[in-house]
Design a protein with these regions (language model features):
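Short alpha-helix in the alpha/beta-hydrolase fold that links the catalytic acid
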Residues: 366, 380-389
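Short beta-strand/loop motif that positions the catalytic acidic residue
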Residues: 363-365, 370-372, 376
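Catalytic histidine-centered segment of alpha/beta-hydrolase-like enzymes
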Residues: 402-416, 431-434, 441
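N-terminal cap/lid segment of alpha/beta-hydrolase-fold proteins
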Residues: 131-197
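Alpha/beta-hydrolase active-site loop
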Residues: 247-268
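N-terminal targeting or regulatory segments adjacent to alpha/beta-hydrolase or S9 domains
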Residues: 1-151, 441-442
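Hydrolase active-site cap/lid region
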Residues: 291-351
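Conserved alpha/beta-hydrolase
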Residues: 222-241
Length: 442
């Protein structure tokens, strides 16, 4: 079920028929491309899609820091920060800010001023969790608002999952795990007693270039529903071991890691699971529900800004980066064609058709909630909306003003209400015993 939002789409389409046609002449196309000097561009473009970044880039310049008083005492912490004005730094809401090569982390609050003349914005600093901001020159804005469950206000169990690529760290957070006194008091006031925890677990799958910390924003909702949550790492995400080729599978390979996480949940008391996925994590969850041997345990999917149509998404980024369509087509072949995929370092080609779900809407068997910002300029929302129009099992809830996977950051109350309401209506978890607590940090 979709909510209507009409945005323009590129006129030229990278269709399955186009891809198939290029595949039939891959050798000839590559020869011509090399002659024209475009093969190198296509290879670079394709590798940008499947090669994991070595480390996140601190791409936000820090212009100045503000203090609560003009007389700055030694050790006094700044209360505001002036940074470059970008689409992301201008967005409303609360965000994390990494600095000092990731060693430092602070929570930034709402925008307090925008200075268009020098293209900067000022945001409040809610809390500095670690590091010294006094001399920083650059940082990285992120949707992550807590880097571990303790920072989010919850007790967690550190576990290891035995993935096909090796042991990988994960957190397990059981119901009633809040450590924050205010959170506990809100729960106690709203609930006549401690509820029995649900026998449904939530398996949390982060997106491309992110880590499991991205998924901690869902803790408030899963705790309200009495769900145990498992926040996993997976191959090539800088926490879990790399795969043999060290390449993203865009969901085509990573689902095997989620299969192991489901096994763990079932072996530790779960009778069923809900998969939560952000961005590429949404693609991974869709593949898991389609292919995993334990897929019958999956009750529902909850997806945030998911990448659901890789053919359209690659075409979109071809257009966004002003790359000629023929080079984008060749880049697709370097991912999908056995004769060319070695150019990207892939051990095996990826079937983009299999992970482009609007073309496979009839194969969906699990109730799916999709939350996606209509202002997402990195993974556009249209495939999410289209999938809801094509499948009666899919519900689409649009958000506004949120950059990619920042739906929670822009409107945490709507995110909480949407998730708890949708899952409760399907008798998943216990009924929420409280409204979302107002403690920022998850």
């Amino acid at each position: 079920m979709a909510t209507e939002h009409a945005h323009p789409t590129p006129a030229r389409t990278l269709t399955l028929a186009t891809v198939a046609g290029v595949a039939g002449a891959a050798g000839a196309t590559l020869a011509c491309a090399a002659a024209l000097g475009t093969a190198g561009i296509a290879t670079h473009f394709a590798r940008k899609i499947v090669v994991p970044p070595k480390a996140p880039v601190e791409d936000v310049r820090v212009h100045s820091l503000g203090y609560s008083s003009a007389d700055i005492a030694e050790g006094q912490q700044p209360t505001s920060i002036r940074i470059d004005a970008t689409e992301r730094t201008l967005a409303p809401g609360h965000y994390g800010f990494y600095f000092s090569g990731g060693a430092g982390f602070a929570l930034l609050g709402e925008l307090t001023s925008y200075l268009p003349g020098d293209k900067t914005v000022v945001r409040s600093i809610e809390k500095i969790y670690r590091g010294n901001m006094a001399e920083i020159k650059r940082g990285r804005l992120t949707g992550v608002v807590a880097t571990d469950p303790a920072m989010a206000g919850y007790l967690a169990e550190d576990i290891e999952l035995s993935l096909p690529v090796g042991p990988a760290p994960a957190w397990v957070v059981h119901p009633g795990a809040a450590t924050d006194a205010q959170t506990r008091s809100v729960q106690a006031a709203d609930a006549p007693g401690t509820p029995e925890p649900s026998d449904t677990w939530a398996i949390m799958v982060h997106g491309m270039g992110a880590t499991r910390a991205e998924t901690l924003r869902a803790l408030d909702a899963t705790q309200a529903l009495g769900l145990t949550s498992l926040h996993m790492s997976y191959r090539n995400d800088r926490e879990a071991p790399a795969s043999e080729d060290g390449r993203y599978g865009l969901g085509f390979t990573e689902w095997r890691d989620v299969e192991v996480a489901i096994d763990y949940a079932l072996a530790h008391g779960a009778r069923s699971v809900v998969l939560f996925g952000w961005s590429m994590g949404g693609s991974i969850c869709m593949q898991t529900a389609d292919l995993a041997r334990n897929r019958r345990a999956i009750q529902a999917l909850v997806l945030d800004g998911p990448a659901l149509d890789w053919l359209e998404l690659i075409q979109y980024h071809t257009h966004l980066n002003k790359i000629p369509l023929r080079i984008g087509q060749l880049g697709v072949q370097m991912i999908t064609h056995p004769a060319l995929s070695t150019l990207t370092g892939l051990k095996e080609p990826i079937s983009l058709q299999q992970i482009s779900w609007p073309h496979r809407a009839g194969d969906i068997t699990v109730p799916t909630l999709i939350m996606h910002s209509v202002d997402d300029t990195y993974v556009p929302y249209q495939p999410s909306q289209a999938l809801a129009e094509l499948s009666p099992l899919v519900d689409f809830v649009p958000f506004e003003k949120a950059p990619h996977t920042r739906e929670w950051n822009v409107d945490p109350q709507l995110w909480f209400d949407t998730v708890t309401g949708w899952l409760s209506s399907r008798n998943i978890g216990v009924s929420p015993l409280r409204q979302r607590n107002q403690v920022i940090g998850c």
